[in-house]
Amino acid sequence: MLRVIVLVSGGGTNLQAIIDAIAAGKVKNAQIVGVISNNKTVKSLERARNAGIPAVCVSPKDYESREVFNEALLAKVKEFAPDLIVLAGFLVKIPETMVHEYSNRIINIHPSLIPSFCGVGYYGLHVHEKALERGVKVTGATVHFVNEGMDEGPIIAQKAVAVEDDDTPETLQRRVMEQAEWLLLPKAVDDIANGRICVVNGKVKHTNSEN
């Protein structure tokens, strides 16, 4: 059974998608053993507790420096002994020590088709604002492994979503979540849990093997 922890900063809709997929049997051989947020007031913590999942807050505001926070975050992660760390809208840069310790065991969901509209400053609604400003006809979401760069790790899966002429950042954001993010992230967890993904020479390869 793959031990999964989910790191979140906001409402936790992607977290909920994984919870629901596990409950429905769409994600097999995986269990969410903990949820960590950097904000104690967000709904994601409530979602976790409602599902019987231990949920804690580790906020940079509670520590004297980023270095001390990074140590506290890594220590809390280790307490859950995860096999996989899922960043589901986690707006804090992951410490390099954690990236190295959990190499190819941290995945992130990003609301664009990487390499478009990604990197420093591209998160949340801002991604969709920039997509509309550029006038793209297709956007989407990407699940990728996390490395030392920002949105630069090996791509696991992508799903395209059409941009409508009357879209606002809010309507586009919602459709990307519904049509891409909420499908891609649980599927990636399932693929990893069941041995269908490996990283070869910096690229993700998909296989049909089962654990």
Language-model segments: which ranges?
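N-terminal Rossmann-like dinucleotide-binding module
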Residues: 1-43
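Short, glycine/polar-rich helix-capping loops at beta-to-alpha or helix-loop-helix junctions
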Residues: 41-46, 95
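Short beta->alpha connector loops at strand-helix junctions that form conserved
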Residues: 56-61, 117
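A short, charged, Gly/Pro-tolerant segment at domain boundaries
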Residues: 199-211
